[in-house]
A protein has these predicted regions:
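Residue-level signal for pocket-adjacent positions within structured domains
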Residues: 17, 21, 27, 62, ...
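Conserved small/polar residues in nucleotide/adenosyl-binding loops
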Residues: 173-174
Length: 174
């Protein structure tokens, strides 16, 4: 259920956007099948809420969402009010296996750490540009340009601001 609904068929398995080791711009809520019959079974077992995350193929796999176990027609009507998004991160075996088998980085734990460092350095620079722009007066904003929007960096900046929580599978020392 969640990003892997049941009954499971390959066309409905949307847990990993395994096209790049860093996919912070994807959101699990866009892959949830709200008609999944497993929700009703879980409710019968007393499960009233879920935190649904992307899979663990990527270093940074995207945003997770908290939902109430209600039978609804849209994911927005299931979202838990005011629950923060989370960011799924994985390091170690899964990213090594997925990308190493393709002869692509990361293929080692060193590659995992390097991918994290690169992403967080870029996110901090993006956040600095946003903060510099926001600190300008309204007049200065009118004659200047806002930083170009970057959906991947927006998610990582949200983590740096403390607005998005991190869920990390297989923590390594970096």
């Amino acid at each position: 259920m969640g990003v892997y609904p049941a009954p499971g068929v390959s066309t409905s398995a949307d847990g990993n956007e395994a096209t790049s080791p860093v996919t912070a711009d994807v959101w699990a809520e866009h892959s949830i099948w709200v008609q999944d019959p497993q929700y009703a079974l879980a409710l019968k077992g007393g499960i009233t809420a879920f935190h649904i995350l992307p899979g663990s193929a990527n270093l940074i796999g995207g945003r997770g969402v908290t939902v109430k176990n209600l039978q609804r027609n849209t994911i927005n009507s299931m979202k838990f009010p005011d629950a923060p998004h989370s960011l799924k991160m994985a390091c170690g075996e899964n990213p090594k296996r997925v990308y190493g088998n393709r002869q692509q980085a990361p293929s080692t734990r060193m590659g995992n750490a390097a991918g994290y460092r690169k992403s967080w350095i870029e996110a901090k620079a993006y956040l600095n540009r946003l903060d510099e722009y926001e600190a300008k007066s309204d007049e200065a904003k009118e004659i200047g340009y806002a930083p170009q929007r970057d959906l991947e960096m927006e998610t990582l900046a949200g983590v740096l601001r403390g607005e998005i929580l991190v869920h990390n599978l297989s923590l390594i020392h970096i």
